[in-house]
Amino acid sequence: MAEANEMASAFEAVLKTGDFGKVQELALTHAADDFVQEWPQSGERLTKAASVRIAEQYSEKSGTSPKFSYKRMLGGGDLFVVEGTIDYGDGIPVSYVGIGELRDGKVTKMTEYFANPFEAPAWRANFVERM
């Protein structure tokens, strides 16, 4: 458990820098050999090797260097959740939630959700508080 706490502290420190590349680098350093990354919104599943290749080529191929804004990280045992926003260079904060699973101090699975902001429907205005 101490190993997981040390890893969580390292992740939190890097997440707070906002440097997306460093976040990816640290994540892959702590990934198990059988690591799987899933992006449900685009229907993609990546192996550790594919994640490494995407991280290496991301800025060049996408034309952007995303910046991460850390909100919080929660978890315990073999599960953790990261919440934040990502700016892909256009100034639009994309909401991010990542759910990580651990085994023997290594990340075995990371499921990540990305959501662009959208205007709430007018019919809900009487039921909600605007943030």
Predicted segments, located by residue:
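A solvent-exposed, acidic/Ser-Thr-rich amphipathic alpha-helical stretch
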Residues: 24-76
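A beta-strand edge to alpha-helix "cap/lid" segment located at domain peripheries
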Residues: 3, 53-131
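Short acidic-aromatic low-complexity motifs
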Residues: 2-34
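Short, flexible micro-motifs
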Residues: 21, 46, 108
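Hydrophobic alpha-helical core bundles mediating ligand binding, dimerization, or RNAP-core interactions
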Residues: 8-15, 31, 51, 55-59, ...
